Amino acid sequence: TFENTATSAAMEHNVVLLTDNADATINRVGQAAMSAAANAYVPEDDGVLAATDLAKPGETVTLTFTAPSEPGEYAYICTFPGHYAMMQGTMRVIQ
């Protein structure tokens, strides 16, 4: 569950979980998102594992998915234009 606590009406966010933690995947998906406005800035890319809807300020979105069975680190980013470089984190899958 993600709550967008931003106060600016233009500050939408999402959470996009990626298939790995590689900089190449993060950059490719983040850059491709800028051309994916019709799909809420989530690009059609094999590097995308799951994604929330865009959350406007004050909104809460929930993502239900099956975590990868392979232990490792999986990046998540915000793909709203210009956000992915600073808005990212890591989900760790352990046994």
What are these regions (language model features)?
Residues N14-L18:
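Beta-strand signatures of extracellular beta-sandwich domains
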Residues S8-H13, A24-I26:
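Short, solvent-exposed loop/turn elements at domain surfaces
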Residues D20-N21, Q95:
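Short loop segments at secondary-structure junctions
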